[in-house]
Amino acid sequence: MDKLHLTFIGTEYSGKRTLGRRVALWRGSKTGNDDLINLPPEACAFHDHFVLPWVVHELGHEYHRGLSEKKILDLNPDLLEHFQRYQFEYHMGSGFAGDDHFLIDWFYADAVYAPLYYGYGAPGSYAARWEYAEHAEERVLQDMPQMILVLIKSRPEVIRDRLSRGESEFPQRHAGSLFKEKDTEFVSDAFQKLFDQSKITRKFEIDTSDASVDESLDEFISK
């Protein structure tokens, strides 16, 4: 079976991580990958460590994850920028090109959240994140041409309702979130724009507003 390079993007509470776990289990069943088949209940196997404060890949890093994700917010914006850039660049390395590679948000989220919440990356500034995303995609197309980009989205009123009710299979994933309800439309529109402008040609959207997780998984598989 061909390798699968996959990036999910979208606002918080759109269902990226929930669907990501189901996709990983499905992929494991197709490839016989025991690491995916036997995922612990709290894990999704995607690299989901690119949005502050959740900057530690959960599998194999439990011993320092809590402290690291608490201390990361003590860094000044310049150091945060350096750290995030290291994470993005690391996952462009050749070591990830040969096997399945699953990511959530990757460098895309910084284009949305860094100017809004982190204190760096605004358009026209040093390390402007929107421009960085454009250049990063050029490298992805060169080194990982089979990458699939998926926008996971929901209507703003659905996002706000899930947020207010804390509706998530991964409540710990949303603890300490910097995402604000008042920013729902702005963030949703920004991810949509990133998706629409993306140079990645293998891309599609999944709207989870009215769909069950199983229905969203079926839609993913069908595409």
Predicted segments, located by residue:
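Hydrophobic anchor at the beta1->P-loop junction of P-loop NTPases
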Residues: 8
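P-loop (Walker A) phosphate-binding loop of NTP-binding proteins
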Residues: 11
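ATP-binding Walker
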Residues: 14
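Walker A/P-loop
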Residues: 17
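Conserved substrate/cofactor phosphate-moiety recognition/catalytic segment
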Residues: 21-96, 112-116
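Loop/turn-to-beta-strand initiation segments
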Residues: 97-101, 146-148
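A glycine- and Lys/Arg-enriched "phosphate-lid" helix/loop adjacent to the NTP-binding pocket
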Residues: 113-190
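NTP-dependent small-molecule kinase module
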Residues: 164-223
